[in-house]
A protein has these predicted regions:
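Conserved alpha-helical scaffold segments that buttress catalytic/binding sites
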Residues: 2-306
Length: 306
């Protein structure tokens, strides 16, 4: 008889590929949830943000669960697939309650809920899902999103609407605000409300990821839960053609992805969203693959919590 136990042959690399898409499933005990929010109506720049959740899902099949840079392996991380909220045909006002309720269902039972928009109007109901009295909000965005609401809700006024709803300005931090992309009026509103403002110049001086880390710590000092809005128009337009509002001189995509991992790792971050990805404007799948990588980075950050 042989004196040793023979090892089972390793699975061929041709059959061993496991994608991030394969992490999505029906495990009700999963600590992370994924919810698609295909809201596209009332976008200031018309487009097809409603296509983004499905495009992101498809692109996840091209993301491996293994990060060779850090040795992180997501193979054992289950993500509950909460499907999509049926809001593609609705206005932001009509979609508010369905999005809030669907997000709340997940945030009440999960450590982290990932919302895939959709335009930036998804952020208001997402924050409401956590509760205005206990939530802090970080927006990674080229714009204040403080347009007046007298003409109705759109993707240019979710922060204004939240302030009117009762969210304290001191609980809001906005990082990545771009020059010549905002108004004096909006800047004044932010100052009067007590919002913490970090421009692109501040990001260049202090470091985008460093500012995200510092604002997470600041808000965690007095907020029970933190919501992080990732508007992809904060990325430099040369690296993100699929964002209608992106401008030259924005954040490097590498820093955007690093911030996703930082947010995913913070224990008080209970909900994140990805907004303003428009597949109809994508070039060479740059936006789709960036969105998928963002999702993987959020999960990698979350894995570090455990």
């Amino acid at each position: 008889m042989p004196s040793h136990v023979e090892k089972a042959p390793e699975m061929s690399e041709n059959n061993a590929w496991r994608s991030v898409h394969g992490l999505l499933g029906a495990d009700t005990a999963a600590r992370v949830a994924f919810l698609g929010v295909p809201l596209g109506r009332e976008s200031i720049t018309r487009g097809r943000c409603d296509l983004a959740p499905a495009t992101l899902r498809a692109a996840l099949k091209r993301m491996s669960v293994y990060d060779l840079e850090t040795g992180t392996d997501l193979s054992n991380l289950a993500v509950f697939d909460a499907g999509e909220v049926g809001v593609a045909a609705l206005t932001p006002a009509e979609a508010f309650a369905p999005i809030r309720d669907a997000a709340r269902t997940q945030t009440q039972t999960r450590a982290l809920t990932i919302l895939a928009g959709g335009n930036n109007a998804i952020t208001r109901p997402g924050v409401h899902a956590l509760g205005l009295r206990k939530a802090g909000l970080i927006t990674l965005d080229a714009h204040f999103d403080l347009r007046d609401t007298d003409g109705g809700l759109n993707n240019g006024n979710p922060i204004q609407a939240l302030l009117e709803d009762g969210l304290e300005g001191a609980a809001v931090s906005q990082i990545g605000l771009a020059p010549f992309a905002n108004t004096r009026k909006a800047h004044g509103k932010a100052r009067r409300a007590g919002i913490t403002v970090h421009t692109l110049a501040d990001c260049a001086t202090n470091g985008f990821v460093v500012l995200v880390e510092s604002e997470l710590e600041r808000l965690s000092g007095f907020c029970e839960a933190i919501y992080v809005d990732f508007d992809i128009d904060v990325i430099d337009r040369a690296q993100m053609p699929a964002a209608p509002g992106a401008r030259p001189g924005g954040i490097a995509v590498r820093d955007f992805l690093a911030a996703a991992r930082v947010a995913g790792a913070h224990p008080k971050v209970k909900c994140v969203d990805l907004a303003e990805f428009d597949p109809g404007r994508d070039v060479g799948e740059i936006g789709a693959l960036t969105a998928a990588r963002w999702f993987a980075e959020v999960l990698a950050g979350f894995a570090a919590r455990q």
